[in-house]
Amino acid sequence: SKCIEGIIRDASELSEHNSEKGALLYIAMTCDTESEENRSSFLDFVENIRPKLSEFSDSLNRRLVEHEAVGNLPARYDLMIRSMKNDIDIFRKENIPLGVEQTRLVTESQTINGAMTVEFDGNEYTLPEMRRYLESNDRSIREGAWKAVVNRRMQDEERLSEIFDELVSLRHKIAKNAGFETYTDYMFRAMERFDYSKEDCLEFHDAIEAVCVPLMREINSERVGTLELGSLKPWDVNEKTGVGPDLHGRAPLRPFENVDEMVEKLSTLFHNMSNDLGEKFDKLVEMDTLDLDTRKGKAPGGYQYYLQKSRVPFIFMNAAGLQGDLETMIHEAGHAFHSIYCSHLELIGERGYPIEFAEVASMSMELMTQDQWGEFYDADDADRARIGHLEGVIFLLPWIATIDSFQHWIYSNPEHSREERASVWNSIRDRFGSKMDWDEYSIFRDVSWQQQGHLFGVPFYYVEYGIAQLGALQLWRTQRKDQQKALTDYSNAMRLGNTKTLPE
């Protein structure tokens, strides 16, 4: 078994190098989607390097798990061997070129989204920058901003629909090649969802519909009544986050003027929580692995990418000075803390924590920092921010159910038409959303799923946010009673990495 342990260590080191190379190329591509050099370098890695690595990894996995001494390995290797066996079960050589084509299509969708800007109020803005106008107390400004964004999105709707059609077809072939009836079944194995089933997800949807949807609709009903809107329009509230104009006519929350101010105040915030978190955040800043501003040509969204060889987290986001941006940065910092807490673990397989628990690290950090938001606001605005964030949890869970339910249908019916897709999407929106008047923009509602990048780039990665939100709320409840215990529980859990199962 000592020989096998040595091979596992060597393979881990090789994986670290390869993972970091791919990470750096992906980061460069998303930071500047207009760079042909960045895009071609990333795709060259995907098309020419990663396929060879996949075959090598499969060959090595088979030799390891079939070795007569594998049963004598120490318990620390149990979960790694389980993952190897799972990878062997679903690996098919004929899926490698399909995976390459999938990445090429996803990259094209990111390039399309990164190039989107709109002319509004005499200036050119990125779509993240336009979000500030959707918080305006002037309904006509909100309407104009929303329509400007929608009209721009509709210019690329056809190509994005084509890309998604191709992705669904590719993914169904991948599943069939691997011996699965649907891509849903395949992904439950590929994502190592050993601890819950499709049926559990559907039951979770039902629970969200029963508990959260009525609360969300009540909040929106109050919005319509208080603001005397007559009816709720899509520019009156963000259905994913609950963000909209203030019910009492107060100016929108603006926690920072620029990224430097946000970073400086977050350093103080984390130091106020604990020296440990403060020092970890300062380390992130010192390492200069942050790209936080929004700009033309930058991919949408936010992420944390851990550089496995350097053991350094990289944070990417599109900050435009909004409360939502502050929450995003805290969210990604939570991921980075998780990565740093795991960095003491020797093997890459030990550091690769379950996705569901990865999101506990980030979502609980959002909740646990709330008491410190006075660093960015006076007392009244800090309360507004906290209330808005907690209401956002109520809005987010139905949105998670929406996206997850949509994906379950998509991949159970891979030969669906676009008309069927629009019809099912709208019925799911009706089930988990609020009554909303779309007027002549119902054509955009049909394809509004395109705004959720996960559907293109990371299929089935979404219900994890809901599972993690429950874990985050539990940790927040602990914090309300005992701040130090919550921080200790947080750090102890994060240090485990992938050495324990999700329930453990």
For the regions a language model picked out, list residue spans one by one.
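Active-site-adjacent "gating/activation" loops or surface patches in catalytic cores
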Residues: 125-142, 244-330, 335-339
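A glycine-rich phosphate-binding loop feature that marks nucleotide/adenosyl-phosphate handling sites
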Residues: 223-247, 283-293, 354, 386-390, ...
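Short, glycine/acidic-rich hinge or "gate" loops at secondary-structure transitions
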Residues: 177-186, 220-238, 279-285, 345-351, ...
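C-terminal, non-catalytic "cap/extension" segments appended to globular domains
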Residues: 29, 83-85, 293, 329, ...
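A well-structured
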Residues: 1-252, 265
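Post-HExxH zinc-binding segment in Zn-dependent metallohydrolases
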Residues: 210-211, 342, 352-382, 388-390, ...
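Glycine- and acidic
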Residues: 90-91, 146-156, 194-202, 244-255, ...
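Catalytic Zn2+-binding segment of zinc metalloproteases
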Residues: 334-348, 368
